[in-house]
Amino acid sequence: MTKYVWFKIVSVVVIVGILIAICVIEDRLVITSFEKVNDYCYEIEEVVKKNGIVNGEVASLVDNLEYNWKVNESALCFLVNHKSIEQMAIEIVRLKTYIDEEEPIEFLVSLELIKHYVETFQHFMGANFHNIL
C-alpha cells in the first residue's frame, strides 16, 4: 500500500475516534446533569413528605436545585436548542411560587413534571448514531 492509502485510513480512523469521544463526553454530561436534578427532586420529595412544603429546608433545596439547573443548563444549551429544555427552569420557578403560596398539591405536581422532563430529555439528548453520522 502506498503512503496515500495509509494516510486515508489513518485519517478516517482518527475522525471516527474523535466523533466517538465527543458522543461519549456528551452522553456523560447529559447523564450527570440530569442525575443531579433527579437526586434533588427525590430529596425534596422526602423532606416534603416528612415536614410539608412550608419549611426552610425545602426552600433551600429548591434554591440548590435552581442553582444546579442554571449551571448545567448553560452547558446543555450547546447540545440542544435552549427552548427544548426551557420548561425545566419554568417548573423550578413554579416550585418556589407554590412554596410561597403554600400549595402542596401543585408543588408535588410540579415536582413530578420535573422528574418527567428529566426522563424524557435523557431520551432525546443522549448519544446515538445520528450524532455520529
Where are these regions (language model features)?
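Short extracytoplasmic
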Residues: C41-A75
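Hydrophobic membrane-insertion alpha-helices, especially the h-region
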Residues: K8-V24
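N-terminal positive-inside, membrane-proximal cytosolic segments immediately preceding the first
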Residues: M1-F7
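Short, charged, intrinsically disordered terminal tails
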Residues: H123-L133
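Structured, soluble extracytoplasmic/luminal domains of envelope-associated proteins
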Residues: C77-M125
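Transmembrane signal-anchor/signal-peptide helices with a preference for the extracytoplasmic
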Residues: L19-K36
